[in-house]
A protein has these predicted regions:
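Juxtamembrane helix-boundary/capping and inter-helix hinge elements in multi-pass membrane proteins
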Residues: 92-97, 178-187
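Divalent-cation-assisted or electrostatically stabilized phosphate/pyrophosphate-binding catalytic cores
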Residues: 110, 187-203
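C-terminal transmembrane helix pair
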Residues: 177, 202-208
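Juxtamembrane boundary at the C-terminal end of a transmembrane helix
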Residues: 126, 210-216
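Membrane-embedded alpha-helical bundles of polytopic integral membrane proteins
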Residues: 1-164
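Hydrophobic transmembrane alpha-helices of multi-pass small-molecule transporters
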Residues: 3, 116-117, 198, 205, ...
């Protein structure tokens, strides 16, 4: 259900409404961070910088880049999160960040880094065969320009870099919360914490993905 809402918001709203809602969510995330009166350190400073950077990118997303690129960046982070969580629960044995995020395992970490690239490139290949359902789903993803400009190897590498940025964003948020001795940044989303808890893995991934695409 949440995925459908995101699709409707990203692709079926006008630029003004899209910009207002996106900026409002980011500003509320900024409020969630600042209201905790967190001392500015490396981790909170990085979060602050990337929240502000994402706010600054709202106009380029609507006027220069495309909603498809924005959605693709979101998808990279989501696939990274889901694959890391599921593979970590199923096969995870070795804890790699005990003082930052004690539930993060090496197996989940590796899955979160590589699975988004494998998933997106696999379905970009399948989409060539005019399979109706795949084509309908894949119309929201913009990866062909990267494949044409960079080739498969560099595109795969670029997607892996974006996945790493997603994981780093999540780890930075986890470290910030541990320093503050809190579980979540907020409680505006029942069962999910605050907006910042949902956005942490996207904050670095989105700018990096857009920067990579600016070279096309």
């Amino acid at each position: 259900f949440l995925g459908i809402l995101v699709l409707l918001f990203v692709f079926y709203t006008n630029n003004l409404f899209f910009s207002i809602i996106l900026v409002s969510i980011l500003l509320f995330s900024l409020y969630e961070l600042l209201r905790l009166k967190v001392k500015l350190n490396l981790f909170s400073g990085i979060m602050l910088f990337f929240i502000l950077l994402n706010i600054a990118l709202v106009y380029p997303i609507t006027e220069i880049f495309s909603r498809n690129l924005f959605f693709t960046a979101l998808l990279i982070s989501v696939i990274s999160d889901v694959s890391a969580l599921s593979m970590g629960k199923l096969f995870g044995k070795k804890i790699i960040f005990p003082h930052i995020s004690p539930n993060k395992t090496l197996e989940g970490f590796i899955s979160g880094i590589f699975f988004p690239a494998i998933f997106i490139l696999f379905f970009s290949y399948i989409a060539q065969f005019d399979l109706t359902i795949i084509n309908i789903l894949f119309q929201f993803i913009e990866i062909k320009p990267m494949l044409i400009s960079f080739g498969h190897v560099l595109t795969f590498s670029a997607l892996v870099v974006c996945s790493i940025m997603s994981v780093i964003g999540d780890l930075i948020a986890s470290k910030t919360k541990r320093l503050l001795e809190i579980k979540d940044f907020g409680d505006v989303l029942p069962g999910h914490g605050g907006f910042l808890d949902r956005l942490d893995s996207h904050l670095i991934c989105i700018p990096v993905f857009l920067i990579i695409n600016s070279f096309i």
